[in-house]
């Protein structure tokens, strides 16, 4: 099979991201042969590696691929990326920030870097699908809650916050309802204290 023919058949899958195993089945070749074909296609800039065994097309926005990175677990865009999307911070993040029930991990790809942060299943809510239903974005309230919640963790990764302006659509009532769902009373109290400080300065 020629490289061009292989590329045509892979495009027939109609997927934004595809696994080496899927390509092997679709092309009717072994996994090692499929891997070799994909590496050659990458050398010619036809496909892009995301992580081991996962590929995508050039010029695909990384934001639309986060669920593929965390599969089989779901994820949604949050933290700095969602705060910027909602106009709550002015600095453009150079990393795509997501939360997921998957473990915390950072993926550096040719398309950019995705930073995935673990949330417990009981806090995996407060997001909306985009119009194409290919990716999900945290609401303004949930993006802030995720930021404050993860700042209370042992790593203190988000302990320092950027200057935040509350979006016009931000609902204090919805935010308070979300805070009440934090199962750990100590972390719930910590998040509420940080929020009160932020709201007092806003």
Regions found by a protein language model. Give the residues of each.
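Short beta-edge/loop segments at beta->alpha junctions of small alpha/beta modules
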Residues: 1-75
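Nucleic-acid-binding surface
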Residues: 57-202
């Amino acid at each position: 099979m020629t490289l061009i023919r292989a590329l045509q058949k892979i495009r027939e899958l109609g997927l934004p991201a595809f696994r080496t195993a899927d390509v092997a089945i679709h092309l009717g070749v072994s996994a090692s042969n499929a891997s070799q074909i994909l590496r050659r296609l990458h050398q010619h800039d036809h496909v892009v590696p995301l992580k081991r065994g996962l590929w995508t097309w050039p010029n695909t926005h990384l934001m639309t691929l986060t669920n593929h990175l965390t599969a089989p677990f779901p994820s949604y865009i949050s933290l700095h990326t969602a705060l910027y999307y909602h106009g709550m911070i002015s600095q453009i993040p150079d990393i795509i920030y997501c939360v997921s029930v998957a473990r915390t991990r950072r993926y550096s790809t040719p398309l950019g870097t995705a930073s995935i942060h673990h949330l417990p299943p009981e806090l995996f809510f407060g997001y909306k699908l985009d119009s194409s239903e290919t990716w999900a974005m945290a609401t303004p309230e949930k993006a802030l809650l995720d930021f404050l919640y993860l700042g209370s963790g042992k790593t203190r990764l988000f302990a320092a916050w950027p200057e935040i302006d509350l979006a016009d659509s931000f609902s204090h009532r919805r935010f308070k309802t979300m805070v009440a769902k934090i199962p750990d009373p100590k972390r719930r109290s910590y998040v509420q204290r940080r929020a009160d400080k932020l709201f007092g300065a806003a």
